[in-house]
Amino acid sequence: MVENVIYPAYLDASLSRSEGRRVAQSAAVEAPTVDEIAKAVQQVGYDAVIERDKRYSREFETRGRVLVNNADDATKNDIVQAVAAYVGILRD
């Protein structure tokens, strides 16, 4: 069983790539929350577990993280790109 971790910093439009953003600026959103990310993960078709007390190592503030379970058929990059697209759709 593979667990992938998605931090809000991966999708944050206010961060640079060197600060932790993993998607293109056009796909990123401003200040994503773990709730939005978890909802998008479920829309993509994977199980999501929210851990609110975790912190991304490059950030000072604790924003939490989302564990993506049962994602054996996709790479982490594929999952992050799909989740970014769905978070953008949820915001519209």
Curated annotation (Swiss-Prot):
The keyword Isomerase does not apply. Keywords: Cytoplasm, Ribonucleoprotein, RNA-binding, Signal recognition particle. Belongs to the SRP19 family. This is Signal recognition particle 19 kDa protein. Disruption phenotype: No effect on cell growth, membrane protein insertion, protein secretion, or ribosome levels. It is found in: Cytoplasm. Involved in targeting and insertion of nascent membrane proteins into the cytoplasmic membrane. Binds directly to 7S RNA and mediates binding of the 54 kDa subunit of the SRP. NCBIfam families: Sig_rec_Srp19_Halo. It comes from Haloferax volcanii (strain ATCC 29605 / DSM 3757 / JCM 8879 / NBRC 14742 / NCIMB 2012 / VKM B-1768 / DS2) (Halobacterium volcanii). The gene is srp19. Pfam families: SRP19. GO terms for cellular component: signal recognition particle. One of its GO terms (molecular function) is 7S RNA binding. The keyword RNA-binding applies. InterPro entries: Signal_recog_particle_SRP19, SRP19, SRP19-like_sf, SRP19_arc-type.
